[in-house]
Amino acid sequence: YGKSEKLKKNCNLILVLGCRDNISKLDSQQKDVFQEIFEVIDKYNLYGKVAYPKKHKPAHIPAIYRWAVSRGGLFVNPALTEPFGLTLLEAASCGLPMVATDDGGPREIKSKCENGLLTDVTDLNALKNALEKAMSNKSQWKLWSRNGIEAVTRHFSWDNHVRNYLLNVYQQNYKLMRLSSSGIKLSCLNGRSSLINPHSSNTSGSEWMIN
């Protein structure tokens, strides 16, 4: 952000750094993070352009996302690795497009939501270019916003999760019923269903786990 004249001219930056009472009472590693932020703000003269709220309540989070949407903003997740990315889904459900690390959960989310860009966050130029690109096309931003809202409901809601789970249970039971009716006996080893070929003398060598 500090190296992009385009971003500094057209955007403000809000850093969500958790909740704190007093920076002086944080542990040394946390203090180092804030010190680095202060130095970057000073180096690129970002005074008046960067905010880092002291506290927020869980109930405030949807309102923060929607406020960013009303401003035509982005949700940026520059973590080096992200196993899933619940915050990305929260942002998408509110219609806030993303720029995120090209790793793990964000890949799955983007493949289903198509609501932003992924980039190599270890390459600062690549991250800067992704942010500039995402902010420069308003029609694309609107499409990403709609895509996120629709896709989260379709792919990641609790109703959809339960529906898929019940469908998988039904499909597994259907497989078992068909195998049982065909004469193949069923057993349970270590809590998992196994298939046993009744015509084989070597039982241990003729078991298949059901996928």
Give the role of each language-model region.
Residues 85-88, 106:
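Short glycine/serine-rich donor-binding loops of glycosyltransferases
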Residues 1, 90-92:
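Short hydrophobic faces within alpha-helices
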